[in-house]
Amino acid sequence: MEVKGKETASVLCLSKYVDLSSEESHRYYLARRNGLQMLRDRGYEVSDEDINLSLHDFRTVYGERPDVDRLRISALHRSDSTKKVKIVFFGTSMVKVNAIRSVVADILSQETITGLILVLQNHVTNQALKAIELFSFKVEIFQITDLLVNITKHSLKPQHQVLNDEEKTTLLKKFSIEEKQLPRISKKDAIVRYYGLEKGQVVKVNYRGELTESHVAFRCVW
């Protein structure tokens, strides 16, 4: 019992030296960087300078306990300047309807957007979800833990390529099939959510492995 007491005391003593603010800023840093990369992969204009910002420089700019409002990201689409998306970070509190309405009102008072991505650290209420459905633009919800790692960079994840409308039409004609005959991939799939895909869009999946032959498959979002 005496040993356990000493161990507990040691843990409590060491906990004083754990910098929770550093952990917090690191989480925000990773989520923001991967959010920027996600936007670029969706075809939005994102600078190398923003993506390659170091953790040290991030903390210099935003501090050890970043203000979530300062972490917001706006980006225009490279091929369609009418498309503008915004990423908004929330703190650790439960996200209620008033918080959603306040954030959206603040954004729309300054700019016009066609898409909004919310990065949360807690649950969102049903009332808030219902309010989100009423907005005229697409709203996507990610937990901050979803963005701590870029899943497209994982060594075990096959490469995914999103087909445009012309490539999709060519594919269907080549194999003389209809869209509904393609193998499906769920809208809830992590890759589908990463690219923000909609029902009917098609992805080309390149499988490469040391134990299996390389092959290509096509999946239709359903």
Swiss-Prot record:
It comes from the Eukaryota. InterPro entries: Arch_Rpo5/euc_Rpb5, RNA_pol_Rpb5_N, RNA_pol_Rpb5_N_sf, RNA_pol_subH/Rpb5_C, RPB5-like_sf. The keyword Nucleus applies. Expressed in roots, leaves, siliques and seeds, and to a lower level, in flower buds and flowers. GO terms for biological process: DNA-templated transcription. DNA-dependent RNA polymerase catalyzes the transcription of DNA into RNA using the four ribonucleoside triphosphates as substrates. Component of RNA polymerase V involved in RNA-directed DNA methylation-dependent (RdDM) silencing of endogenous repeated sequences, including transposable elements. Required for establishment of DNA methylation. Belongs to the archaeal Rpo5/eukaryotic RPB5 RNA polymerase subunit family. Component of the RNA polymerase V complex. This is DNA-directed RNA polymerase V subunit 5A. It comes from Arabidopsis thaliana. The lineage of its organism: Eukaryota, Viridiplantae, Streptophyta, Embryophyta, Tracheophyta. The gene is NRPE5A.
